[in-house]
A protein has these predicted regions:
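Glycine-rich phosphate/pyrophosphate-binding loop shared by adenosine-nucleotide-utilizing enzymes
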Residues: 73-77, 95
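A short acidic/small-residue loop/turn micro-motif
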Residues: 82-84
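Proline-centered turn/helix-capping motifs that create local helix->coil transitions or kinks
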Residues: 37, 170-175
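A short helix-loop-beta-strand connector motif used in the catalytic cores of GNAT acetyltransferases and
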Residues: 51-67, 76
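Short amphipathic alpha-helix that is part of the acyltransferase structural core
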Residues: 2-53, 93
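Acyl-donor binding region in acyl/amide transferases
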Residues: 88-172
Length: 175
């Protein structure tokens, strides 16, 4: 467990390796998107198999998932992926983050991004891109406009503050 911010309002980042944290990881979007008529809930069994039981992907791709907690309640989540089949680019190996969901709090986003970056760097990644949920063949990118319409198939949904919170962490959008 990584304790990010000391004190009563502390943020803890916990690897989603047991039943409780995996359940929190899977159900967190329900909290983030409560009351959002444009959000379509994913199939939980599919999400669980994809993130925690995806044996073919795991044969060549290292994947880690974390949940951010504040005062015992889940407030964010993220994954990091490093695919050994992807050749390095001219400026080094690229790692990916994805499945990021969090409350509107800069400290939570900072803790999640830092955790993913540290994990990727420890495995040799020179840079990080995302969000990729979990590969380029799944949902990629970040919704930055038209938040009032449901996503198309294989497209993610986000709250309007995600773009700002990720930019605060030095992550710039590309088109």
């Amino acid at each position: 467990m990584l304790q990010v911010q000391p004190g009563p309002d502390s943020i803890s980042i916990v690897a989603a390796e047991d039943a409780r944290t995996q359940r929190d990881f899977l159900h967190l979007p329900e909290r983030i998107y409560a009351g959002d008529p444009a959000w379509i809930a994913p199939l939980l069994i599919e999400q669980k198999q994809r993130v925690f039981q995806n044996k073919p992907l795991f044969a060549h791709c290292a994947v880690a998932a974390w949940v951010a907690y504040r005062d015992g309640a889940p407030v964010g989540r993220i994954t990091a992926q490093l695919d050994t089949l992807q050749p390095p680019e001219a400026d080094g190996t690229i790692g990916y983050f994805g499945m990021i969901e969090a409350v509107d709090d800069e400290a939570v986003f900072a803790a999640l991004i830092e955790t993913a970056q540290d994990w990727l760097r420890a495995r040799g990644a020179a840079r990080m891109r995302g969000p990729y949920n979990l590969t380029i063949n799944e949902e990629i990118g970040l919704l930055v406009e038209n938040f009032d319409t449901p996503p198309f198939l294989m497209m993610g949904h986000a709250r309007p503050y995600y773009d700002t919170r990720l930019a605060e962490q030095g992550l710039d959008g590309i088109k």
